């Protein structure tokens, strides 16, 4: 492995887009809840908003691959990483414009389409940005540079909501009711600013002299077998998802909604308590088979991805011709790892609120600081991992590995307090941060070793989370954010190791697997309806078992190929 010097000028320019990804997400955190209220969306339509965003990543990366297969060259590599990011930003700006027009004209389908276009742009940006990060220095330290980008992204995600809240409400503390009562003119102005940010960053990148083009016009062999495999997986996923979405408009679902409306009308009268109890019992009888049916289809969707990728792995090993980037086993296993990692990270974050509500009897305002700490934990870990992206003395790195996570923890608590939340119950979480610091020392800045250690810690955390009670279980589940924080860069760099001219194509395949965020979280949600919210976190444990195995296997695979990531 070469010891190529890091191009810091290009690196610092590139991380600006990571910051604005996080900052723009803050705009969405206001815009999307407003749209849900403004359009008076039912449960089905609300699910469509979340699904459209994740599915766009899958579709965008698949379209890039189809174009590349048809032309015999990877479009991102041909355009260059720099131009691809610019095109992605402009594409997202068009989507932002479509969302603004749709909201102004009260057209929900148009807003949904606009959000889909925004996410398609993100798909192109991330397909280019991650291998771009790796290419700016030694391939073996690429995970550190991706961690730096992730840390800056988390910073944007953390401070963005405060800036948006101050700009719109004049206060850092914002409730869901505040968002719902926003004037249409303010919301449209907010997203106009988001659209202008897309254009502004595109201009920054387009005219930057520090960023190399990142072009690679080398021809790549056709990947017809990989395309056929992915199209089959896509078709089967549509078959699995269609019944889930149609179930929200089924006769049983409509009956449930009608009975819930009846309960709302009767709740004000004490004399109607018996009638309400009967209606609630009817809802349970209607909902149970409906939820079980949805869980079956979501489970089949998960099986389609897992089995489809494993079958592709088996066939590409027998004859690598026609598989493109998927001829490399580390990539296919990495695709499954990204799918599972994104799924478990989003699943724990999405279901944490429900756990705190039912097991700890907390209300929405009391849950908010815990949710902020979970997502803030991602920033804590990424900041610590990013230390190794800089050429510092070993002693300095050792000191910063201790200091940086503690400072980041203090910043997360400070910003959460600034938003008007009580953080006194979160001080003891510093113990979890210290455990993460120990994990970094044991990992020795080696991606496979670090991934294995943090996957094991994630496994332990989820097991403690669903087997204990009280604040111990809460801290354990919160710490999943700490242990997930380094997984994206580690999986990315290990999966793309040794791919050469197929690196951009491999990156697109990995981005496709963000789809895990659309399958695993609702699967846990449906499981919780059947066995309870706390036991449902066993799904996280299963995910971390695979990630541990992946870290062990991929290290051996790369060594056999003469690649040393240690």
Predicted segment positions?
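C-terminal ends and interior cores of transmembrane alpha-helices
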Residues: 90-105, 409-423, 440-444, 457-469
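Glycine-rich segments within core transmembrane alpha-helices of 12-TM secondary carriers
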Residues: 141-172, 198, 506-521
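Extracytoplasmic
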Residues: 9-41, 61-64, 160, 348-356
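Conserved MFS/SLC helix-loop-helix module at the cytosolic interface between two early adjacent transmembrane helices
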Residues: 61-109
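Intracellular juxtamembrane helix-capping segments at the cytosolic ends
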Residues: 124-138, 349-352, 485-500
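C-terminal membrane-cytosol helix-exit motif in multi-pass small-molecule transporters
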Residues: 164-173, 192-219, 226-252, 296-316, ...
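Central cavity-lining transmembrane alpha-helices of secondary-active solute carriers
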Residues: 47-74, 372-385, 516-519
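Extracytoplasmic gate region of multi-pass secondary transporters
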Residues: 28-32, 236-285, 324-381, 414-416
